Amino acid sequence: MKKLLLTVIQIALLFIFARLINWVTALLHINIPGSIIGIVILFTLLHFNIIKLEWIELGAAWLLGELLLFFIPSAVGVIEYGDIMSKFGVSILLVVIISTFVVMVSTGTLTQLIAKRKEKKHTCSSEL
C-alpha cells in the first residue's frame, strides 16, 4: 500500500512539474514545446542531484510501463478521420515505414561506428 501511495505521489509531482513547465513556456511565448523543455530541465536536475532519482523513479517507471494507454486517444483520432485515411492512408503508411527503416539503418550504422571507435581506442591504449 505504501508503494502504491508513493507511486501516486510521484506521478502527481511529475504531472505538476509538466504543467508548470507548459505554463512557463506559454507565458514566455517560447516556440519549443513545454514537454521538451521539461525533459531537458528534469534531466539537468537529475544530473546535478538537485532532484534525487528515488523521488520520481516509481512514478516514472509506472508511466513508462503504461505508455501504451496514452496513445489510445491518438488512435481514436486517426479512426475519426477515416476519409482522410482512405485518401492518404497508403502514403502515410509508406512514410512511416520508410522513416522507420531510415532511423533503424542510421542507428545501426552510428552504433557500429561508435563501437569501432571504442575498439580502436581500446586497442591503442592496450598497446601502450
Curated annotation (Swiss-Prot):
<feature type="transmembrane region" description="Helical">
    <location>
        <begin position="26"/>
        <end position="46"/>
    </location>
</feature>
<dbReference type="InterPro" id="IPR005538">
    <property type="entry name" value="LrgA/CidA"/>
</dbReference>
<dbReference type="InterPro" id="IPR023760">
    <property type="entry name" value="Holin-like_CidA"/>
</dbReference>
<dbReference type="GO" id="GO:0005886">
    <property type="term" value="C:plasma membrane"/>
</dbReference>
<feature type="transmembrane region" description="Helical">
    <location>
        <begin position="88"/>
        <end position="108"/>
    </location>
</feature>
<dbReference type="GO" id="GO:0019835">
    <property type="term" value="P:cytolysis"/>
</dbReference>
<comment type="function">
    <text>Increases the activity of extracellular murein hydrolases possibly by mediating their export via hole formation. Inhibited by the antiholin-like proteins LrgAB. In an unstressed cell, the LrgAB products probably inhibit the function of the CidA protein. When a cell is stressed by the addition of antibiotics or by other factors in the environment, CidA possibly oligomerizes within the bacterial cell membrane, creating lesions that disrupt the proton motive force, which in turn results in loss of cell viability.</text>
</comment>
<keyword id="KW-0472">Membrane</keyword>
<comment type="similarity">
    <text>Belongs to the CidA/LrgA family. CidA subfamily.</text>
</comment>
<dbReference type="GO" id="GO:0031640">
    <property type="term" value="P:killing of cells of another organism"/>
</dbReference>
<keyword id="KW-0812">Transmembrane</keyword>
<keyword id="KW-1003">Cell membrane</keyword>
<protein>
    <recommendedName>
        <fullName>Holin-like protein CidA</fullName>
    </recommendedName>
</protein>
<dbReference type="Pfam" id="PF03788">
    <property type="entry name" value="LrgA"/>
</dbReference>
<keyword id="KW-0204">Cytolysis</keyword>
<dbReference type="GO" id="GO:0012501">
    <property type="term" value="P:programmed cell death"/>
</dbReference>
<feature type="transmembrane region" description="Helical">
    <location>
        <begin position="59"/>
        <end position="79"/>
    </location>
</feature>
<keyword id="KW-1133">Transmembrane helix</keyword>
<feature type="transmembrane region" description="Helical">
    <location>
        <begin position="4"/>
        <end position="24"/>
    </location>
</feature>
